[in-house]
């Protein structure tokens, strides 16, 4: 006797690399179709300027290249006969998962920072105050040079998509994932317990680097302990999501959190 497969099995299971990449398609394409109309881009974005150069700074050629890259996202899955992963329901689930994680992350970071400030500083905003002061995890929307509320929100949404994709690519896939793999190999860490504690320590360091990233450069924020700690906790949450759920859920969570802060 055979039992029917659970239709949600593919949705809730951790995705493979190709599926993970394909599920970020709306984030990637949405950012690149929008950022071309803004005077700034995400600091981790190394693609937009290259695309503009290849397109000879022609708007229509740039848009065509962006859509072609988007098509390239899904082609490997289609060729592998895994087009089911591109069904609308899969993206809807990814968005819902991102919303849940973003809300939980904001609450967790708020509680953690409130506790930290109560221990090491005299500043006490209270939990509600910290929620209202929760910082963005991408470039400041004021940097986009918009002049009206609607324009600021649109720019904030676009920059949020870029932060979600590129900062997760740099900090979770690059610094945390690839960095840990290289260091484990370099130092010949083989025991399971050693690997675990190494990854925990490396995750904390990567989260601190991620947080510090937001204070660097002309458009960086002014440093303060509260926002640094808040972003560090968020970096740890993103790392947990990346480790146990994959790249796409981390991207969606990051983008949706920033949209919540910058555009809503």
Give a label for each model feature.
Residues 52-69:
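Interfacial helix-start motif at the membrane-water boundary
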Residues 23-44, 109-110:
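Alpha-helical transmembrane segments of multi-pass membrane proteins
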Residues 1-14:
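Short, Lys/Arg-rich, polar N-terminal cytosolic tail immediately upstream
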Residues 39, 71-73, 105, 109-110, ...:
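Alpha-helical transmembrane segments of polytopic integral membrane proteins
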Residues 17-33, 97-101, 202-209:
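Alpha-helical transmembrane segments
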């Amino acid at each position: 006797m055979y039992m029917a497969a659970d239709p949600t099995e593919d949705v809730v299971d951790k995705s493979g690399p190709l599926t993970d990449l394909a599920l970020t398609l709306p984030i990637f394409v949405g950012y690149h179709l929008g950022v071309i109309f803004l005077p700034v881009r995400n600091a981790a974005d190394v693609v937009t300027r290259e695309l503009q150069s290849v397109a000879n700074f022609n708007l229509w050629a740039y848009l065509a290249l962006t859509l072609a890259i988007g098509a390239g996202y899904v082609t490997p899955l289609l060729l592998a006969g895994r087009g089911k992963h591109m069904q609308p329901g899969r993206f809807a689930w990814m968005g819902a998962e991102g919303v849940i994680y973003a809300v939980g992350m904001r609450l967790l970071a708020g509680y953690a920072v409130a506790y930290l400030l109560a221990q090491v500083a005299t500043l006490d905003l209270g939990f509600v105050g910290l929620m209202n002061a929760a910082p963005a995890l991408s470039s400041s929307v004021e940097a986009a040079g918009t002049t009206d509320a609607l324009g600021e929100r649109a720019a904030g949404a676009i920059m949020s998509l870029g932060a979600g994709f590129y900062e997760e690519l740099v900090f979770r896939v690059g610094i945390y994932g690839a960095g840990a793999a290289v260091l484990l190999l370099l130092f010949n860490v083989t025991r399971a317990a050693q690997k675990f504690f190494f990854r925990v320590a490396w995750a904390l360091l990567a989260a601190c680097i991620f947080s510090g990233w937001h204070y660097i450069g002309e458009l960086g924020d002014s440093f303060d302990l509260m926002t640094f700690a808040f972003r560090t906790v968020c970096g740890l949450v993103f790392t947990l999501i990346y480790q146990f759920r994959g790249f796409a859920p981390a991207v969606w969570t990051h983008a949706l959190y920033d949209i919540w802060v910058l555009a809503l």
